[in-house]
């Protein structure tokens, strides 16, 4: 007996994974065997349905085991609720995550094609691209806004249909997160990149206006701010 499992999902952007059971041989209608599904470490409460009915699926080392007699066309629906969360990194900086993805500041990108010097083309090819932006990027999060109790209300998640377009770019990013931030007045460009900054400052006297910023999945960006300074 050879089972065939067809998976349909918008993961890692969407929460739901649907698996349909089939059999390679047309004469096989039913068979008993276990199915195993790994629950991601970030998911605190996975939900499982078989043919639309909720089932208890004991977790053993973050693995769900479903053993039963399966019929052709049975469907297992897994839902991994994706909550916005923050983690702390270098120097006390804050990183925003949702589900398995890390998020970065969305900035409009200006791509410019440039030619290498003739003597370098054998090694590097004929040309390269520079990517720049005119958008502001010097933002920080308020400490209170990235507290666990405020993440759900302060970070607005927008999910759009994935469709057939390639999702890993700014134009087609299926998920975005709107968040409140403050301008960090003394964080400036240095040598074509972000200048040095104190990632964590309890005083916070270097902040300016409060604004709304947009975050998109890290993999959709070329230019990115991912580790944000934190101010009280």
Which residue stretches match the model-derived regions?
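Non-cytosolic beta-sheet module surface loops
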Residues: 9, 23-25, 38-41, 68
């Amino acid at each position: 007996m050879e089972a065939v499992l067809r998976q349909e999902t918008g993961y890692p952007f969407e929460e739901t994974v649907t698996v349909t059971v089939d059999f390679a041989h047309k004469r096989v209608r039913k068979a008993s065997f276990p199915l195993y599904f790994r629950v991601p470490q970030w998911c605190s409460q996975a939900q499982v349905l078989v043919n639309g009915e909720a089932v208890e699926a004991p977790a053993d080392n973050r693995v769900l085991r479903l053993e039963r007699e399966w019929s052709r066309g049975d469907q297992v629906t897994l839902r991994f609720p994706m909550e916005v969360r923050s983690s702390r990194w270098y120097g006390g900086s804050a990183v925003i995550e949702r589900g398995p993805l890390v998020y970065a500041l969305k900035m409009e990108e200006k791509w410019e094609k440039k030619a290498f010097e003739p003597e370098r083309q054998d090694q590097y090819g004929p040309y390269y691209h520079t990517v720049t932006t005119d958008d502001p990027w010097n933002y920080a999060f308020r400490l209170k806004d990235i507290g666990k109790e405020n993440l759900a209300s302060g970070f607005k998640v927008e999910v759009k249909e994935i469709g057939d377009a390639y999702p890993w770019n700014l134009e087609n990013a299926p998920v975005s997160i709107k968040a409140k931030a403050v301008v960090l007045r003394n964080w400036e460009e240095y040598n074509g990149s972000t200048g040095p900054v104190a990632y964590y400052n309890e005083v916070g006297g270097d902040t300016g206006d409060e604004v709304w910023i947009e975050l998109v999945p890290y993999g959709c960006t070329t230019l990115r701010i991912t580790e944000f300074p934190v101010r009280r």
